Amino acid sequence: MNESPLAFIAHSALAPSGYDVQGRLNSHSAKAVPAPITLAFESSGNRSTRGALRRSFRQSGTKRVTDEQHRVPGPGDGDGLGIPPVAGVPWQAGLALAPPINRATMAPLPWTSNGASESAIGTSSANPGASEAARPVDQNYWQAAGQFRRLVLVGLVLTQTYLATSLMAAVLPYHGREPLEIAIVTLFAILFGWVSAGFWTAIAGFAIVLAGHDRYAISATAVPDAPVSPAVRTAVVMPICNEDVPRVFAGLRATYESLARTDLAMQFDMFVLSDTNNADSRVAEVEAWFETCRALDAFGRIFYRWRQHRIKRKSGNIADFCRRWGRNYRYLVILDADSVMSGECLSTLVRLMEANPGAGIIQTAPNATGRDTLHARAQQFASRVYGPLFTAGLHFWQLGESHYWGHNAIIRVEPFMRHCGLRRLTGRGLLSGEILSHDFVEAALMRRAGWSVWIAYDVPGSYEEMPPNLIDELKRDRRWCQGNLMNFRLSVMNGLQAAHRAVFVSGVMAYAAGLLWLAFLVLSTILLAVQILRDPQYFVAAYQMFPLWPEWHPEWALTLAGVTAGLLFLPKLLAAIAVAAHGAKPYGGGARLFASVLGESVVSMLLAPIRMLFHARFVVTTLCGWGVAWRSPPRNDAETTWSEAWRQHGTQTLIGLVWAAAVYSLNPGFLWWLLPVLGALIVAIPLSVLSSRVSLGRKLRDAGLFVIPEESHPPREIQTTMEESRRADGALPGFVEGVVDPAIVGLLCATGHVRPRPKPALRARRATLVRAALQRGPDDLSPADRMRLLCDPVALAQLHQNLWTAPHLRFAWTGVRASRTARPALRPAQ
């Protein structure tokens, strides 16, 4: 018998005679494997063979097959590929990775266009169920209130900054008249204004949280359980790239199961949009998708799309989805790889969109949860306690011109496709090219086109995860810094609302503040040296008639330091008061709540100087043209090793020691003013290591510190995510299994694309690739060759058949496979 490779896999991977009535392998059913080795693929019958393989998978559960059990069925095994159905995978489910393509366009507009001219857009979108007017139906009843509120904010910040800056100038020896003092006062004014804006945002949020509502809150417009037309369909998409596969599909499963408990479940589809370029992860993703669909009976509801050409990273991934299937949906919910959303939250977002036809984006306020390291637990606590104040405050000032953070948000598809395509930034260097931080830009473009962007700060059921340690947080900040600096170029774009220009500026200040703070401290130290090492100057200005005596008022300096500290700490205290007013028991009780606030303040105070130096370096290196690789962050509790801490923080420790020694030699008393900064830099290495420890985080949790409601009373979605992630951890196939394991090879081939009439050049490349894989084994294959094999079902099937028909060739592959961590057999759903 000399079959085509796909037929070989269809028979051997899915043969029924090797299984007992419970679907388990029968170890006594081994037969001989046919001997011929072929590198040719018979083009005739490809479609029918692949169709038979699909039908077999539709009716069967994938099963792990040992070397002896890999076999071709004999004449007595049944007629053709008649595989008895397996529970959980009905015939109708199929293996459709994605729905049929319904092509549309999503062309980026010129950055100078205001998006109002329909003729300049050239895109048309949706089906009748998704079709909407080109312009939003929005009376902008909130716009006058938003403008007035922002004027009040500007007035408060400017007044407060003026008073503090005047006091700062009075503190300096020459009252801000020397060039060095002018620079110090200027930096202080910018930094104090930045702190003041955050302070007044928290004050506004505190007022809203205590009052319980805001008259302009978007959440107040939805009617609970309001009927939604069946024509209104929503896609939930999760773009991923080389992510932790168990965590991704655990969160997806929790979201799907929660959604299934709502009345709008049948109006949602879910998509995993993969940009993965790692062969091991790619195999694991396909199998995890299949297992998830089989367990949930979700074939045709949960889809998987792998993108071969990774253009424009995440924004390009979403744009690719919109071009293929955007016309099928009115709304689009975007999740991150660590996101979880409740079905009630998703249903509420759809109803909010239906109630507000002028809304283009509604952003939720995700609660951070799921981590156990000390660093992450402090961040989770801060996000859960202080976050509601700041998000409510952002809503208060921005209203319908709010932030969009790129995930855990709902988007109106048609205007998004019309107006939010992202063009490359012209020029050279790191501040040109593809947009990296796309979310702020998309929100600005949506608002520029007339659609409102809201923060639904009080809609519960939205969750995310924090970086597990300081180093991983800073790696993420490095990427965001470059993206925000690029976005600053767009702050002068034609047609933008002032609120979104301010958003671009605030994105830059989030990282430039570190550089400005460092410059302020360095100039202050230089001023100290000048005052000590240089004779006093009594005439510091041209045509000065009377001498200016240098003065030092330590009591004024203490007052200024106290005011600044109050602006930083008071919002945290107010947040704790607001939480206690609504019940502190989910946070460990009132005493532990305030103790946790104090502890988090100490941790943040120690980490702030470390972040300052890193952020300053990020800004400088980005402006100098030093790029950074965008990699997926860890999705588990990764701890920092001592060697990694030395590499990352060694220079900071040296800077802290040298700086402290220099200040002490100049004026020992002045060292106390810089001790909170320099002391943190000196202990950066042990601080980074210890804050990453899971054991310390869990001890604090056991003591009732840094406790959040998602831990004391975990929602069902979080419980499901944790349970499924733990259950699947360590049980994933990789590239080797994707070539050797018949069940997984069958799955990959069944979900792959076969060209019906391959050209001779393709046949030759395929034969060369298979021959190289046979000769070199998996370890010597390049990452690109591995991905090419997985993308070509025919080549994969040829390689698989040759390995199983030639034991001496299979040794290089099975040896690797045997050394891997064993995982449970793939079993039919019970």
Predicted regions and their residues:
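Short helix-terminus and kink motifs of transmembrane alpha helices
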Residues: 197, 201, 205, 249, ...
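Acidic, Ser/Thr-rich low-complexity segments on the non-lumenal side of membrane proteins
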Residues: 222-263, 606-617, 715-756
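N-terminal membrane-anchoring/stem segments of glycan-assembly enzymes
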Residues: 2-26, 30, 34-228, 503-539, ...
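C-terminal amphipathic alpha-helical interaction region
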Residues: 634, 642-830
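Basic/Trp-rich segment in TM-proximal cytosolic loops or flexible interdomain/linker regions
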Residues: 106-116, 120-122, 126-160, 173-182, ...
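Internal catalytic domains of large membrane-associated glycosyltransferases
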Residues: 103-104, 111, 115-116, 122, ...
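Composition- and surface-driven signal marking solvent-exposed, interaction-prone regions
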Residues: 181, 185, 250-252, 334, ...
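Short, glycine/acidic-rich beta->alpha junctions
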Residues: 184, 188-191, 251, 341, ...
